[in-house]
Amino acid sequence: RVIVTSDGEIDDECSIVRFLLYANEWDIEAIVTSSSQYHWQGHKWAGDDWLEPYLAAYAQVYLNLAKHDPAFPTPEFLKARTALGNVKSEGDMKEETAGSQLIVKVLLDESDDRPIWLQAWGGPNTIARALKSIEEKHPEKMAAVAKKMRLFFIWEQDDTYQKYIRPRWGKFNIPTIISDQFVAFAYHWEKILPNQSHPVLRGDWMNRNILKDHGPLCSLYKAHDDGRFRSEGDSPAFMHAIPTGLRSVESPDWGGWGGRLLAQTEPARLQVSS
């Protein structure tokens, strides 16, 4: 089960294409637009509705995807689980929003006690706002909610984890991953990835195999103008949750598609990139 929060940066837009193409791998509980220290309403903002073209393109290719696996969620299912979160400023968590309320609804649902991976592709502020609402309105349920939660942050792109989540929820020892290994899959990949990986990220390969004549969803993928891979810095957040047989979800220090993590002694159950 996954909940995605994203600030709509251009590499988030690349990651959302891959996320939708892999949507059969998890139960998607919510896709929420959030903010970060880099992007919020009025500052390098992609727009409150930046997800709409991607969901529309997914609807166009859904029937073809479903031929390969009926587990792909319907476009209507995804649309009903997409909402605008806290986006007014960096670290915004002052008010409840449709996005934070959607997260609250999922976390308080007692009909399903399976773990939920809450991913912050931008700042974790909308997640923080949801948790604050639960603390204020349902304090007796905090322990049960925390037991289901797993956190995966691509960096800490605002201060709400340190200022709210960790101080108020840290006592529950929620498994938490803060990753900086995304750099291998981000803007400076040409300097970081080994040379043998470069051919499938070059423009000729990308144009031939992804960008051109591969349907409306792939056509939205924001590579460089010449077709070169740009960045998917947020993809490790969901790649970690893909069941590859490596059991990295159970033990992140074993390593998986989202990276290999190193356990910290303080706070307990925090994992950082190794």
Regions found by a protein language model. Name each.
Residues 1-274:
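N-terminal acidic, glycine/proline-rich low-complexity segments
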